[in-house]
Amino acid sequence: MNAFNKLVKHSKKISNFNHLSSIVGWDQAAVMPSGGAEARSQAMAELSVHIHGLMTQPQLADWFAEAESETLNIEQQATLREMKRQWQQATVLPEALVEAQSLAGSKCEHAWRSQRKNNDWAGFEKNWAEVVKLSQEEAQIRAEATGKTPYDAMLELYEPGATTEQLNRVFSDVKTWLPSLIDVVIEKQSSESFIAPKGHYPAESQKALGLDVMKLLQFDFNHGRLDESVHPFCGGVPSDVRITTRYNESEFVQSLMGIVHETGHARYEQGLPKHLAGTPAGEARSMGIHESQSLFFEMQVGRSPAFIAHLAELAGKHFSAMNDPVFRVENIQKLYTRVQKDFIRVDADELTYPAHVILRFEIERDLMNGKIKHTDVPELWDQKMQAYLGLSTKGNDQNGCMQDIHWTEHKSIMSTAKHDYKNGCLQDIHWCDGSFGYFPSYTLGAMYAAQFMASIRKTIDVDDVIRSGNLTPIFTWLSKNIWSKGSLLTTDELVKAATGEVLNPEHFKNHLKSRYLG
C-alpha cells in the first residue's frame, strides 16, 4: 500500500470517530437530560483527545512526505492537499490544550442555556473567561505556526484562504450603503399593512408542515431527520443528517423558515461526493459555502414569491385555515420580507442580518488579536448596536452578547448601567464553544448565495421552476457546481468555476435592492 492510500485509510478511521462525536453532539443538544451534562462533557473530552491523537500520530509526517513524491491524479492531489491541511492544523495544538478547551467549552455552553434566560452576565463571564483565554492561546499558537495574525489563523479553520484584510474591505463597503438602505426600506414599508399570525399553532402541526416543506425541497429522509432543540442547527454526518428547529405555538413563521434554512445545510451534506466520504476532500468546502446553501434555500428560494405561494397553501392546509387572511400569499410574502431593526440575530430579517454579523466579526477579531478584553464586550456590543442598527442593549445583554453559543466552547470597559445581556452579548451559542472566526461565514454565505442565483438565472427560468413545485433543475445545478465538488477546489476556484468570477458582493447588493425596492 502506497503512502497516499495509507493516509486515506487513516483519514477514514478519524472520520468514523468524528461521526460518533457529531451524533453525540446532536444528542446533547436535542434529547439529553440536563443531569447527563457532566458525564457527557467528560466523555466528549476523552473522545476529542483520542481524535486529536489519531490526527497527530508521528508516522503521518513520513507518509505525507512520501505521498508528495508519488504519482497522483488531480483528484488525489486535491485529497492529499486537504488531508495535509487538516493534519497541519491539528499538529500545532498540544493535547492538553485540546482537552482543556473541550471541558471548558462544554461547561460554558451548558451553563449558558440557563444564564441567558436569567440575564446572568456575571455567571457567564466566569466560565467564558476560560474559553477566551484558551482560544487566545490557540490563536497565538496557530499564528506562530502559519505567520498569520491570530484572528486570521482562526479564520483559516472556517474559511480557508480568507483574511481579515479581505473581510475588512468587504464589510467596510457594506457599512457604506446598508444602514441607509435599511432606513429607506423601513420607511417604504411603513405604509404597508399586514396581518401577523395570532392564535394557537400546535407544535405537532408545525412539524408536519415543516416535513412537507422538506419533501418539497427534496430532503432525503432515508439519510436524515427533523428534531427540536433550543438553538436550531444542522448536525450529524452526510449519511445521517440531523436538523433541528424550535417551535413557538403563538406563531409559525420563524420555525418554518428555520426548517427551510437547515434543509439547505442538509441538502449540501447529503449531496457531497460519496466516493470521497471519509476524507477531507469529501467534506464541505468552507463554512461560508455551507452557509451559502442554507441561505440559498432560505433567502433566494424560500422568500421568493413563487415559493411563498407553496408555503401559504401548505400552511393553510395544516392549520385548517385556508380562508384565514393570514395565509394569503401576499400576506405571507409581507411577513417574510418585513424589515425591522431587532436585537436578536437569529430573528433578524435578510436586510438587517449583515449588521449583526459585522458587529460580531469586529468584536471577535479584536478579541483574538488582543486589542480588547472579554470584559469589554458588553459595552462594545452596545456601541456597535447603536451605530449599525440604532438600538441599545443597556438594560438588555440577553438579546445582546449572550445570544450566541459559538464563543463559549472553543475557544475592561464595563458600563455602570445595567445591560440587557440576554438580548445583547449573551444571545448566541457560537462563542460558548470558542468558534471565533465563524461569524463572517454567515454574510459571506449570503453573498455567495446571491451570486449563485444570478448565475443560475442565466440558464434557468427560476420562478417558473419554483412555481411548478419540481425544483429539480435548480438542485441539479447546485449538485453539479457546488455539492459534488466537496473540497476538491479552493473556495475561489469553486465560485469562479460555478459563476465565472470570484466573490463579487455587488450581486448581494443588487439582490437586496431588487427585492426590497423593486
Segments (PLM) and residue ranges:
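Divalent metal-coordination and catalytic microenvironments
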Residues: L7, A143, H261, S294, ...
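A well-structured
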Residues: M1-P160, K513-L517
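All-alpha helical catalytic cores of prenyl diphosphate-utilizing isoprenoid enzymes
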Residues: F171, K175-L178, A203-K207, V213-D227, ...
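C-terminal, non-catalytic "cap/extension" segments appended to globular domains
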Residues: A3, S22-G25, G35, A39, ...
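Contiguous, non-catalytic segments that form substrate-binding/exosite surfaces or channel walls
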Residues: Q101-F252, E501
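Post-HExxH zinc-binding segment in Zn-dependent metallohydrolases
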Residues: E283-D324
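Active-site recognition of the HExxH zinc-binding catalytic motif
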Residues: Q254-K274, E291-L295
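Secondary-structure capping and boundary motifs in well-ordered enzyme cores
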Residues: A39, A100, N127-E130, V170, ...
